[in-house]
């Protein structure tokens, strides 16, 4: 690995990823050619066809009035990157896609904690996707590019950060897998980290900062065929496998930054920091509030505890306001810091948590289904003060979401939406379009459930799952997984296995012990909101009783020992099994489908008959829809989805489709109750079967009497009882009216049919359709 100057002022560093029999990938960082006015800019390449530009800029003056770090990450997808014109009305890119938003979050999560505390200059990282191979994913490359451009920007940043995707394929962990290779994977992980020193062997010591992982869509089928299931130990193994790749990527970025800084001397920029509080403020707050606050933090109920701590805070602010006039923000920050210290100390020394639980205890659990009357499926899941309502809606497959982004996915049959209204935390705030956090939480719950969903052949429905966070005090995203499993089963969705989720936390610090100090790690099961805020790790894990389906980890520490992480995974599994037992008491198998849910039936028609079923400008299929009330969707392979609110309407539509696609030719002598569809000077055309008409000549309409005009006897829309008198070689059918005294032999026409055949030849064969109800 080395840095090369490919032309004057343009430098590049390359990392080669060797996956053995799975091939090699080349990641290249280039700077000095594009976006030269940014504080730092890098063009990152993955092999030859994937190219993106990351530019990092910083405001010249700090925003002293802010009490947070103003970092913004934006990912700009350009449709030209895939050789496409945007599908929007204006034919240009608009609001970011879900893929772009999720990539922003992947970048932000490891980047934000790597900046120095107290920085108040606005920092913006913009990643523009310039070229992408449809067989590759750009998100992990974007993490590395954002880190590299930030490292080059001369900012107070403790990077660089390396990101890698590893997938378990045929028992081997493969780095930077292609989309094609991922189809054979059982587990897929995006991992970001940084080098924090060297280990005992002198190799780079990598601290994992962020993990986003999921089982793949076809994991169960692959495991049944002999593939390794993604158990907790396998997941921990994957985290270790990723570390050498992360080290190589970080080293390349650092070497590039070192060479550029030595060749292109820029005047150093000073970025002032603004500590949240001064030591004098903290000492005064601690002296005044420690005892009362420690007692308040033993109150188990969240609302009562918050009320008491707010009372103490108000008293402290009032008593110290005169002493620290103009530094009120510091007083509030110092009070929060004291709260954090007390909570962490009690956990580390006494294993005593805010609400009185032990470190592995789960709060009270409650599960209930069928709580929303007309919903196709619904459930209410409660864990302590966290309350999630899950609602399932089923519809035709054609209602799947169409995706216009640079990702490989063009449509999504299962859509999971998460809502987090402000009242869930007892606050006021904006409601409306989802924020990035809501999109991210919905995506996490979706990834947890996709591996257990039935295939479209097994369950021909589009599924929309909505998670309403009605109460929040710790991990509404994992509560959403539990509520969604319950609601899906209540809707009659045949899940391959139920899924539950749990949020874990970690507190670590040096604790005095036997006259010395030791580094102590305490893993917490089912963390509260305060434990999430004051802890060192947010670790969410979802899965079945047998394996992990989704995992998300963020940590503020410079590395978590492998045995601590393995213990957290095992602890999470114990909690997951407990929750699954409670869920099974509410519902342990799919319910009957709601009477309000559509009934969808699938049939197959020959591909060369698709055009006949649709008809010119959709005339035939629209007529069937209008007559039967069913919704019809036809795929390119001849699969037809027929949906209706009742089975009779769906079957009537299927009969009509089969009459066109799998016709049984009428014979001379057969009788029908048909509808007049066209009138000419020489007779009336009568519809016998969908797509098949016959002619009653004008001479046959008068019942032996001569008539001058066809309209004197019949009009379009009239029903006639007719018999086939002749069928010409070219297929033309001649009809005669059935005498009134013979009409009893002709069966009455069904209300939903254009024509009824006397011998029922329009009925679909019993094995021609598969019903899902």
UniProtKB/Swiss-Prot annotation:
UniProtKB keywords: Cytoplasm, Magnesium, Metal-binding, Nucleotidyltransferase, RNA-binding, Transferase
Xref: InterPro entries: ExoRNase_PH_dom1, ExoRNase_PH_dom2_sf, GPSI/PNP, KH_dom, KH_dom_type_1, KH_dom_type_1_sf, NA-bd_OB-fold, PNPase
Entry cofactors: Mg(2+)
UniProt region (Disordered), positions on chain: 749-773
Domain KH: 598-657
Gene Ontology CC terms: cytosol
SUPFAM superfamilies per record: Eukaryotic type KH-domain (KH-domain type I), Nucleic acid-binding proteins, Polynucleotide phosphorylase/guanosine pentaphosphate synthase (PNPase/GPSI), domain 3, Ribonuclease PH domain 2-like, Ribosomal protein S5 domain 2-like
Occurrences of domain S1 motif (ranges): 669-738
Entry's localization field: Cytoplasm
Top enzyme class: transferase
Reactions the enzyme catalyzes: RNA(n+1) + phosphate = RNA(n) + a ribonucleoside 5'-diphosphate
GO biological process: mRNA catabolic process; RNA processing
Binding site for Mg(2+): 532, 538
Pfam family, one: RNase_PH
One MF term in the entry's GO annotations: 3'-5'-RNA exonuclease activity
Protein function: Involved in mRNA degradation. Catalyzes the phosphorolysis of single-stranded polyribonucleotides processively in the 3'- to 5'-direction.
Similarity comment: family membership: Belongs to the polyribonucleotide nucleotidyltransferase family.
Protein name from the UniProt record: Polyribonucleotide nucleotidyltransferase
Organism: Mycobacterium leprae (strain TN)
Lineage: Bacteria, Bacillati, Actinomycetota, Actinomycetes, Mycobacteriales
Originating gene: pnp
């Amino acid at each position: 690995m080395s840095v090369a100057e490919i032309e004057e002022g343009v430098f590049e560093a390359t990392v080669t990823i060797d996956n053995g029999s799975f091939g090699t990938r080349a990641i290249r960082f280039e700077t000095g050619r594009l976006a030269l006015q940014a504080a730092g800019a890098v063009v990152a390449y993955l092999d030859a066809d994937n190219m993106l530009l990351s530019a990092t800029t910083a405001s010249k003056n700090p925003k002293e009035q802010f009490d947070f770090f103003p970092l913004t990450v934006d990912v700009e997808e350009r449709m030209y990157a895939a050789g496409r014109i945007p599908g929007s009305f204006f034919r240009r890119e608009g609001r970011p896609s879900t893929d772009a938003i999720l990539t922003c979050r992947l970048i932000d999560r490891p980047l934000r904690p790597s900046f120095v505390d107290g920085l108040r200059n606005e920092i913006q990282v913009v990643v523009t996707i310039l070229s992408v191979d449809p067989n590759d994913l750009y998100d992990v490359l974007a993490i590395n590019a954002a880190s590299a451009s930030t490292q080059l920007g001369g900012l107070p940043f403790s990077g660089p950060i390396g990101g890698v995707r590893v997938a378990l394929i045929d028992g081997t962990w493969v780095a930077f897998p292609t989309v094609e290779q991922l189809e054979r994977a059982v587990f897929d992980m995006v991992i970001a980290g940084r080098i924090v020193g060297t280990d005992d062997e002198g190799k780079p010591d990598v601290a994992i900062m962020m993990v986003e992982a999921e089982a793949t869509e076809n994991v169960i089928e692959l495991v049944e065929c002999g593939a390794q299931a993604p158990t907790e130990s396998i997941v921990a193994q994957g985290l270790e496998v990723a570390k050498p790749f992360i080290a190589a990527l970080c080293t390349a970025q650092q070497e590039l930054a070192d060479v550029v800084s030595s060749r292109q001397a820029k005047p150093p920029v000073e970025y002032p920091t603004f500590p949240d509080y001064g030591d004098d403020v903290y000492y005064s707050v601690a002296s005044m509030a420690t005892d009362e606050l420690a007692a308040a933090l033993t109150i188990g109920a969240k609302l009562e505890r918050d009320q008491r701590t707010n009372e103490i805070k108000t008293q402290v602010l009032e008593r110290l306001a005169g002493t620290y006039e103009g530094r009120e923000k510091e007083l509030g920050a110092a009070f929060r810091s004291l709260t954090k210290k007390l909570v962490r100390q009690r956990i580390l020394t006494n294993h005593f948590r805010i609400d009185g639980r032990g470190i592995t205890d789960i709060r009270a659990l409650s599960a209930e289904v069928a709580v929303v009357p007309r919903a196709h499926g619904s459930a209410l899941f409660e864990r302590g003060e966290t309350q999630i309502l899950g609602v399932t809606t089923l519809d035709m497959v054609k209602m799947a979401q169409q995706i216009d982004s640079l990702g490989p996915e063009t449509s999504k049959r299962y859509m999971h939406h998460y809502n987090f209204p402000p009242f869930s935390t007892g606050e006021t705030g904006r409601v409306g379009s989802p924020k990035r956090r809501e999109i991210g939480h919905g995506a996490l719950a979706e990834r947890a459930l996709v591996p257990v969903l039935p295939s479209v052949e097994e369950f021909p429905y589009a599924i929309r799952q909505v998670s309403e966070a009605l109460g929040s005090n710790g991990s509404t995203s994992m509560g959403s997984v539990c509520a969604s499993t319950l609601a899906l089963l209540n809707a009659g969705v045949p899940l391959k296995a139920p899924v539950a989720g749990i949020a874990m936390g970690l507190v670590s610090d040096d604790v005095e012990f036997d006259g010395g100090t030791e580094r102590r790690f305490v893993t917490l099961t089912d963390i509260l909101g305060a434990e999430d805020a004051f802890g060192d790790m947010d670790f969410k894990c979802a899965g079945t009783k047998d394996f992990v389906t989704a995992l998300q980890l963020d940590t503020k520490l410079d590395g978590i020992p492998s045995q601590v992480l393995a213990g957290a995974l095992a602890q999470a599994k114990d909690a997951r099994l407990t929750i699954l037992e409670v869920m099974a008491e509410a519902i342990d198998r799919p319910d009957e489908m709601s009477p309000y849910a559509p009934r969808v039936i699938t049939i197959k028609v020959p591909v060369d008959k698709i055009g006949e079923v649709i008809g010119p400008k959709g005339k035939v299929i629209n007529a069937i829809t209008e007559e039967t009330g069913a919704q019809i969707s036809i795929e390119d392979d001849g699969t037809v989805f027929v949906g209706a609110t009742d089975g009779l309407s769906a079957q009537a539509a299927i009969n009509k489709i089969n009459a066109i696609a799998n016709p049984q030719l009428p014979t001379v002598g057969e009788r029908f109750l048909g509808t007049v569809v066209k009138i000419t000077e020489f007779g009336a055309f009568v519809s016998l079967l969908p797509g098949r008409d016959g002619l009653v000549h004008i001479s046959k309409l008068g019942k032996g009497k001569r008539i001058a005009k066809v309209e004197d006897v019949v009009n379009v829309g009239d029903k006639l009882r007719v018999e086939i008198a002749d069928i010409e070689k070219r297929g033309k059918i001649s009809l005669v009216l059935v005498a009134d005294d013979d009409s009893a032999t002709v069966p009455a026409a069904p209300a939903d049919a254009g024509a009824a055949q006397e011998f029922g030849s329009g009925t679909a064969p019993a094995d021609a359709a598969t019903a899902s109800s």
